[in-house]
Swiss-Prot record:
Main location: secreted
Keyword terms, alphabetized: Glycoprotein, Secreted, Signal
Described function: May be signaling molecules that resemble neuropeptides. Ligand for alpha-neurexins.
Record gene name: NXPH1
UniProt xrefs under InterPro entries: Nxph (IPR010450), NXPH/NXPE (IPR026845)
Protein name: Neurexophilin-1
Length: 271
């Protein structure tokens, strides 16, 4: 003999609390445990994806066939079934909530200051034309990014003359005295550390028409040379010093590249 009592407590909140109590006789078991078990019934209920689940439906299927053991009358209204599109939308929304937040894209590491701008062959050139000489000098500067840089020169000349191309500090005085061209002050030598790394000179001779008199044939010498300097810090600014001497023409020129273009550190000349 068993007795079961059910109480429904209606509170102010829109939640229904269901309280059950059961008295079992000796050796007896709950009628709920005898009839199929709640585990399999609940599993069957929660796996139905085409019907809405409610507390009334859950209790009505769990206690089906047990009308004599309870005085609780639960009304069940047939829910409005979901469409297939609604189910797919629900699955998609639940999946989106479980996906981890995407990582912010990292910016690529850019090393600044390692490679500076370079002067190409077209950035520096010197073209000298006289009656007896045709001269073209081109150069470029390359910063290796490791504290050193190289200066390259190409020299092409046809005719007779004496050409000298060298690197000097900005304080080098422009003058025609040959003895002063290779002298560097002691204070400048500390901030000017350059040496010749490579040098090559090719010469050839040929007889061509003279520039001053096309009716005559003149002996002309063709010279092609390549030279490179390797400079290392500490240094401030280097200048290119060109001196040219011939029987009818004399030229001395000092060219200092725009160091503000070549380096991140501005250079302000003094003196």
């Amino acid at each position: 003999m068993q007795a079961a009592c059910w109480y429904v407590l209606l509170l102010l909140q829109p939640t229904v609390y269901l309280v059950t109590c059961a008295n079992l006789t000796n050796g007896g078991k709950s009628e709920l445990l005898k009839s199929g078990g709640s585990k399999s019934t609940l599993k069957h209920i929660w796996t139905e994806s085409s019907k809405d689940l409610s507390i009334s439906r859950l209790l009505s299927q769990t206690f089906r066939g047990k009308e004599n053991d309870t005085d609780l009358d639960l009304r069940y209204d047939t829910p409005e079934p979901y469409s297939e599109q609604d189910l797919w939308d629900w699955l998609r929304n639940s999946t989106d909530l479980q996906e981890p937040r995407p990582r912010a894209k990292r910016r690529p590491i850019v090393k600044t200051g390692k490679f500076k701008k370079m002067f190409g062959w077209g950035d520096f050139h010197s073209n000298i034309k006289t009656v007896k000489l045709n001269l073209l000098i081109t150069g470029k500067i390359v910063d290796h990014g490791n504290g050193t840089f190289s200066v390259y020169f190409r020299h092409n000349s046809t005719g007779q003359g004496n050409v000298s191309v060298s690197l000097v500090p900005p304080t080098k005085i422009v003058e025609f005295d040959l003895a002063q061209q290779t002298v560097i002050d002691a204070k400048d030598s500390k901030s000017f550390n350059c040496r010749i790394e490579y040098e090559k000179v090719d010469k050839a001779t040929k007889n061509t028409l003279c520039n001053y008199d096309p009716s005559k044939t003149c002996y002309q010498e063709q010279t092609q040379s390549h030279v490179s300097w390797l400079c290392s810090k500490p240094f401030k600014v280097i200048c290119i010093y060109i001196s040219f001497y011939s029987t009818d023409y004399k030229l001395v020129q000092k060219v200092c590249p725009d160091y503000n273009y070549h380096s991140d550190t501005p250079y302000f000349p003094s003196g």
